[in-house]
Amino acid sequence: MPTVFTAAHLWDGDSLLEHPILAVEDGRILSISTRATAESPSTPNTLDFPNATLAPSFLDVHIHGASNHDVMEATPAALDSIGRFLASRGTGHYLATTVTAPVDDTLRSLSALAKLLNKPADESPIARPVGIHLEGPFLSHLKRGVHPPEHLQPANIALFDRLYDAAEGHVRLMTLAPELPGAPALATHATSRSVRVSVGHSNATAAETRAVIAAGAVSATHTFNAMRPLDHREPGILGVALSEDSLYAELICDGIHTTPEIVRIWSRCKGPHRAILVTDAMSATGMPDGEYRLGGLTVTVANGRATSGGVLAGSVLTLDRALANFLRFTGSTLEHGLRLLTTNPTALIGSPGLAPSPGHIAPGLPANFVAINPDGSLAASFVRGQQAS
């Protein structure tokens, strides 16, 4: 017997429906109707969210870990723990994001992640990685953040191919500093292998940034953070990230990496179709204050701030809190906010194998969705039709 979900609204990734009736069976969406076109369901298997909006589960394209595990551990236990926590906070899919490390260590992690990604998904209600985001090693020494300088590498196509091959083609996104010699050639090569290139961790000029965009870059990594600051005579990478209409731009909306004023500037520049909310979360996410790992680094978390050597080292943010913060900081509509963690990240990394899911609710798709309160807070999360907790 199907389970029926009713709510005030349903946003399917394209349009907003009032008074929806969502039927789910065997982990997939059976049908979508409204109380204007169908009778109210009379089944004992009905869950009603009278004030909430049903929406696609979130997609995080920049996350290093959670629940005391780092994705570079690349073990079934680590990804299971990360996935269960993320699902409980509304995230259904993510890109397992690396941090700069010795090349051999990175190769081992990528190879192990590939083996896990190649396995058929079971029916457990957990978030699953849909690929890998290479954050490093092709980053600027000046804007490296906590990435260890001794393991940063020049823009090297041969090394990229070793990393890509170790990951068995699962690299979907790569952060690249545009000012590195050879960066445009690497961007072109990565794009030819269906890897989306994101500019970031960079002290690049505007001209250097535009050259890499012309070579194929399509996004900016955690905009404002680890970037050359804006100057009216040399707008740099940040000026291009904000002003280039075609470029997607990530943002960590936690009130620590960016202030409400900065969030409003970013939102007004990028609009509803090129802005992407990310967490940059690390293993301490969902855990109490203390010391945790980010790749090979030791990170101290106190009062929601993750640092290593006094430098911000990822976050302990979840996407449901990022959404609530965004709505509170900007006064935007819920539909606008939902785009930034569903359809926009899906469009960034999208391919025939992913579209139209994640990022959409439609008959036949896996029943991965959330119920969101009017203030953006999470009411419930469902993966394959099962409530995640």
Q: What label would you give each PLM region?
A:
Residues M1-S40, F382, Q386:
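N-terminal metal-binding scaffold of metallo-dependent hydrolase/deaminase domains
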Residues H64, D80-S109, I126-S140, A167-E179, ...:
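Divalent metal-dependent hydrolysis catalytic cores, especially in the metallo-beta-lactamase
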